[in-house]
A protein has these predicted regions:
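Polytopic alpha-helical membrane-helix bundles and their juxtamembrane interface segments
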Residues: 1-252
């Protein structure tokens, strides 16, 4: 993953950030609060793990900015920054306290940057096979629509909750996340280097469907908060570190 970088210092730095991210995320889970709670992981370790990924993403950009992978790295770095803002909004660390709609908007903007990065990558590298690209996109959009219907809309109705504005805002958001997964899958079908990118995008959608169920439909189970983060955190990491595979692709 790191062999396409120019110097050992760059490799060690990005590997080190990966280790710190894993220690914050998984260490926060292992050494967190009481196991009976909905979440063991403390808020500070969750926010810090996302902040480390922002640093990693901009480090990738700094190391690749003079290569054809630089544009992709910058778009991913900006997308990850909006992801961190979304985390802070949902955790209540921004002025005004917890703001679900602001969090959704931040994540949605982040994914628009991810989508733009993938579209530009596909155009630049010739990974534009129509069946792979549009077929994967169509399938994932259907998955996103079905997930929103079952988890958010039907889930709310089943619990006697009248769907409100935020439930309907969740629909285009789910479709944006599904589009990210679809485009990533399209890339992976044409170049196996991007399988981990596709996995990351799929995990992000899964994590957000669980989160939507918790917030909008009253879904609950033991350690649900940790399940959300143990899918979301690796999802963001795989998207950020996909820059390595882009660099390998353009340097071949």
């Amino acid at each position: 993953m790191f062999l396409s970088l120019s110097t050992p210092v760059q490799r060690y730095w990005l590997i080190g950030l990966l280790i710190v991210w894993a220690a914050l995320l998984f260490g926060g889970f292992i050494f967190g609060g009481a196991p009976e709670a909905a979440r063991r992981m403390p808020a500070w370790s969750r926010m810090a793990s996302s902040a480390v990924l922002v640093v990693a993403a901009f480090s990738w950009y700094a190391f690749t900015r003079h290569t054809p992978a630089g544009a992709y790295a910058l778009l991913v770095a900006i997308g990850m920054t909006f992801g961190l803002l979304g985390d802070l909004a949902l955790a209540g660390f921004l002025p005004g306290g917890r703001n679900v709609i602001a969090g959704i908007i931040s994540f949605g903007i982040g994914h628009i940057f991810y989508i733009t990065a993938m579209l530009r990558l596909a155009a630049a590298t010739g990974l534009t096979n129509p069946p792979a690209r549009w077929g994967a996109l169509a399938i994932w959009l259907l998955v996103g629509l079905a997930g929103w219907y079952l988890v958010v809309l039907r889930g709310a109705n089943a619990r006697g909750i009248t769907p409100g504005v935020v439930h309907w805002i969740a629909l285009p958001y789910a479709l944006v996340l599904a589009a990210t997964a679809g485009l990533a899958t399209g890339l992976a079908l044409q170049d196996s280097r991007f399988i981990l990118l596709a996995l990351g995008a799929a995990l992000f959608l899964l994590s957000d469907l669980i989160l939507a169920g918790e917030m909008f439909s009253g879904m609950t189970f033991r350690l649900i908060g940790d399940v959300i983060w143990l899918t979301y955190g690796p999802a963001q990491m795989l998207i950020v570190y996909s820059i390595a595979h882009v660099l390998a692709r353009v340097n071949r």
